[in-house]
Amino acid sequence: MNLSKIHHIAIIVSDYEAAKDFYVNKLGFSVIRENYRPERKDWKLDLRVNEHTELEIFAEENPPKRVNRPEACGLRHLAFCVESVEQTVNELTEVGIECEPIRVDDYAGKKMTFFHDPDGLPLELHE
């Protein structure tokens, strides 16, 4: 078996426009395609994170609330590799995104921090 890389990650959001603004205008991901699917009454937005990875955003009518504990089963957080945590935190702060204090990962010895998307999904920056 050769699982060489992650192609995409899919998340369900409660507010399509807020999520689109956050991921496109604040984080800078580019839109690959955007579709409203009337048979499902939902939006599907495909975003390019980098040359290898995509993020799929689904917005359904009245989705169940996310369990907002990192220790709950399912996706714990989504981590992005950056060259400089400090620089990226400054850029996020400039567009109104609040980050936790920067700390060093006890095991990897790398700088890291967390922030959240509009639905509270934890997002990590990691050097």
Where are the predicted features?
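N-terminal beta-strand motif that seeds the catalytic metal site of vicinal oxygen chelate
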Residues: 1-18, 75-80
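Vicinal oxygen chelate
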Residues: 2, 35, 46, 89-127
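Core segments of cupin and vicinal oxygen chelate
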Residues: 12-53, 94
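Short amphipathic alpha-helices within nucleic acid-binding modules
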Residues: 22, 86-91
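A short, acidic/glycine-rich surface segment
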Residues: 32-34, 41-43, 62-68, 101
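Exposed loop/turn and edge beta-strand positions of beta-sandwich/beta-sheet ligand-binding modules
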Residues: 41, 74, 109
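Short, charged/polar surface micro-motifs in flexible loops or helix N-caps
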Residues: 50-54, 62-63, 85-86
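Short, charged/polar, Gly/Pro-enriched secondary-structure boundary elements
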Residues: 52-55, 120-122
